[in-house]
From Swiss-Prot:
Pathway listed: Cofactor biosynthesis; NAD(+) biosynthesis; deamido-NAD(+) from nicotinate D-ribonucleotide: step 1/1
Protein name: Probable nicotinate-nucleotide adenylyltransferase
GO biological process assignments: NAD biosynthetic process
Function, as annotated: Catalyzes the reversible adenylation of nicotinate mononucleotide (NaMN) to nicotinic acid adenine dinucleotide (NaAD).
UniProt keyword annotations, A-Z: ATP-binding, NAD, Nucleotide-binding, Nucleotidyltransferase, Pyridine nucleotide biosynthesis, Transferase
One Pfam family recorded for the sequence: CTP_transf_like
Organism field: Dehalococcoides mccartyi (strain ATCC BAA-2100 / JCM 16839 / KCTC 5957 / BAV1)
Catalysis performed (reactions): nicotinate beta-D-ribonucleotide + ATP + H(+) = deamido-NAD(+) + diphosphate
Cystine connections: none
Matches recorded under PANTHER family: NICOTINATE-NUCLEOTIDE ADENYLYLTRANSFERASE-RELATED, PHOSPHOPANTETHEINE ADENYLYLTRANSFERASE
Domain of life: Bacteria
Family note: Belongs to the NadD family.
Length: 204
């Protein structure tokens, strides 16, 4: 059986933006992935004290953003899970759901890579997947040797990219909408229309 190479891009996607799509495309092309699965979070444990948009809206925006990319798809497994969302649990679920020979490539930013040794079941994460870490503009390159000391085996699992450097964030999109500014250059047109139609991120 031929192995499938599947990229995993998780996030709150509140909202999904062009930077997410650029990252997914870059990693897919560079590593020769067969597909990329977008996984919106349910209630992420690291944002438990913050208000995020309803899961249905975040899921719908991802569906709209990737609708013209046959090699992108979305799964709602974290949204359906009750309680906090943990990456290790999601990777274990994917190992059960996806074909047996599937190789997982989990995408994250350099900032999240720095924090990885403190994540829930971090050792299990690096056992279940390859890590693909990409920068955002202005971020300092992680000290991989130091991270490997904190989490042995991380370096062997890691693919450290120097690009794409994306200077877009969901918080920027939300802020611009709240201030009545356009976001058509930051999110796909269908997502911009959805935000407007459903009055997301507007001042209450």
């Amino acid at each position: 059986m031929v192995s499938l190479k599947t990229g995993i891009l998780g996030g709150t996607f509140d909202p999904i933006h062009t930077g997410h799509l650029i990252l997914a495309d870059e990693v897919k092309n560079r590593l020769g992935l067969d597909e990329v699965i977008f996984i919106p979070t349910g209630q992420p444990y690291y944002k438990a004290d913050k208000t995020i948009s309803p899961a249905e809206d975040r899921l719908n925006m991802v569906k709209l953003a990737i609708s013209d990319k046959p090699y992108f798809r979305v799964m709602d497994i974290e949204i359906k899970r009750s309680g906090p969302t943990y990456t290790a649990d999601t990777l274990n679920d994917l190992k059960t759901i996806l074909p047996e020979k599937t190789e997982l490539y989990f995408m994250l930013g350099w900032d999240n890579l720095e924090a990885l040794p403190r994540w829930h079941k971090a050792s299990e994460i690096i056992r279940l997947c390859r890590l693909v870490a990409a920068p955002r503009i202005g971020q300092v390159k992680p000290d991989v040797d130091e991270l490997d000391d904190k989490l042995p085996g991380l370096q062997q699992s890691l693919i450290l990219l120097s690009k794409p450097e994306v200077d877009i964030s969901s918080s920027l999109v939300r802020e611009r909408v709240e201030n009545g500014q356009g976001v058509e250059h930051l999110v796909p047109a269908a997502v911009a229309s959805y935000i407007k139609k459903h009055n997301l991120y507007c001042r209450k």
